[in-house]
Each structure stands twice: as C-alpha cells, then as structure tokens.
Amino acid sequence: MAAACRSVKGLVALITGGASGLGLATAERLVGQGATAVLLDLPNSDGETQAKKLGKSCAFAPADVTSEKDVQAALTLAREKFGRVDVAVNCAGIAVASKTYNLKKSQAHTLEDFQRVINVNLIGTFNVIRLVAGEMGQNEPDQGGQRGVIINTASVAAFEGQVGQAAYSASKGGIVGMTLPIARDLAPMGIRVMTIAPGLFGTPLLTTLPDKVRNFLASQVPFPSRLGDPAEYAHLVQAIIENSFLNGEVIRLDGAIRMQP
C-alpha cells in the first residue's frame, strides 16, 4: 500500500500573496518544517525582505497573479533556483466593500471594482493553477503516483456573504465551485487540489482595526471566541500536503462561525 502521508520536508512550495498574512505564515511554517518556499507577491510588497528573513530556503518572485508572463517567470525562478515546484498555495486576494446599489447615495456598485476583485481573486487563482499544473506535470511521481498539491484560499463569504460583499463573495464562491472540477481535471496527472475557506483571521486587514471592532468580531466566533491565527491556517496547509487522500474538497476553518447579514 502506498504511504498515506508524506512529509513537507524537502518539498518546494510556490505561495502567492506570500509577503504577508496567511501566505507569509504558510511560508514560515513550511520553511520551518524543512521545505523551500518561493514568495510570489507584487513588486511593491514586502516580499523581498520577508524572503531574506527566511534565509536560503526562500526566494521572492515579484509578480501579479493575473499576468501569465509574471507567473511563468516565477515558475521559471522556482525551477532554476530549487529544481521544481511540488506545492502551490494561492493566498493572493483583495476585497472591496460596496453595496449592489446604495440608495442613500443613489449610486450603483461600479463594474470596475467588481471586475477588479474577480480578476485578482478568481481569475488570478485560476491563472496560477493552470500554469503551475504544467510545471508539476514534469515532476517524477512519488510512490503513490502524486506529482503535486494545489491549495486555494476561499472564504466563509463564499457561503454567507454579508452586505457589501457581492464582488468578494462571487470571487470566493467561484474558487469553491471550481475546486472539484479542477481536481478531476488534474487527477490523471497525479495533482491534488484543495481549498481552505477561512473565517475571521488576524491578518493585516483586521489587525489594523480598532480594538473595539476586533473584539466584537472575535465575539461572533462560537468557539474559540477569537480571531484565527494565521499560523493555524498554515498548519492546515501542512496537513493537507501531508495527507494524500484529501482531494477536491473545501475545508472551512472558522471556529463554527456563520456570518450574519
């Protein structure tokens, strides 16, 4: 019988949005467990500094996830520096808060904002998936036939979108919806595809809010009643990588929260 679990030690991971938040926490954990990481993030991000902090087992690839040229360049960097790509973790994303129609302002949600969120969160994720799949397909399969693992980031907003989250929820719902068909598409290549749907996490977006607001948000989580720690997201990423029977599924990581309108 093929081994059910594999260690992350020695694996090479491409992590989008790797300069901060969930992406950086993932890089820190994987490198700490003996893996190698390539942080893919925008040129004006803190990616280069963070990669240097993580040492020789990490590199920075300045890139926009919506650009085929940029992502290909990042994959080339990973291959030339570390030999291959075994894991891809898609954490890059943006959010826009806007009602479909604001009656008080007599203003409709702009198509530009809606398209921008879809372009980065959904199309950007798919862009990375389709390109990294070709890279992983060149890997020698392990004893279980696996060549790679792709892990995407959705959100609980994919299931319980709040007021003003039409664009964000649509983008994350798209990631949820494409997880299974892509897993089926890539199964013959020995590539697994999973998605994590985080709840409220202590990422830069939330940690900059006033204490009163953060404490209120934390109180909405049934148990434990706090914001998630990015390290907990990273821990789940590692567990998914190491468990070869996880495929085509979306895992909520949210302390049982169900968002209200």
From Swiss-Prot:
Q: Which GO terms describe its cellular component?
A: mitochondrial nucleoid; mitochondrial ribonuclease P complex; mitochondrion
Highest taxon of source = Eukaryota
Broad class of where this protein is predominantly found: mitochondrion
CDD domains found in the cross-reference section: HSD10-like_SDR_c
| Residues with PTM N6-acetyllysine | 53, 69, 99, 105, 212
An example of a Gene Ontology BP annotation on this entry? fatty acid beta-oxidation
Places the protein is found? Mitochondrion; Mitochondrion matrix, Mitochondrion nucleoid
Keyword NAD part of the UniProt annotation = yes
EC number, as in UniProt: 1.1.1.35, 1.1.1.62, 1.1.1.239, 1.1.1.178
Binding residues for substrate = 155
**What is annotated as the active site?**
168 (proton acceptor)
Annotated metabolic or biological route of this protein: Amino-acid degradation; L-isoleucine degradation; Lipid metabolism; fatty acid beta-oxidation; Steroid metabolism; Lipid metabolism; bile acid biosynthesis
GO molecular-function annotation terms? 17-beta-hydroxysteroid dehydrogenase (NAD+) activity; 3-hydroxy-2-methylbutyryl-CoA dehydrogenase activity; 3-hydroxyacyl-CoA dehydrogenase activity; androstan-3-alpha,17-beta-diol dehydrogenase (NAD+) activity; chenodeoxycholate 7-alpha-dehydrogenase (NAD+) activity; cholate 7-alpha-dehydrogenase (NAD+) activity; estradiol 17-beta-dehydrogenase [NAD(P)+] activity; isoursodeoxycholate 7-beta-dehydrogenase (NAD+) activity
Quaternary structure? Homotetramer. Component of mitochondrial ribonuclease P, a complex composed of TRMT10C/MRPP1, HSD17B10/MRPP2 and PRORP/MRPP3. Interacts with TRMT10C/MRPP1; forming the MRPP1-MRPP2 subcomplex of the mitochondrial ribonuclease P complex.
The entry's protein name is 3-hydroxyacyl-CoA dehydrogenase type-2
Q: Which gene encodes it?
A: HSD17B10
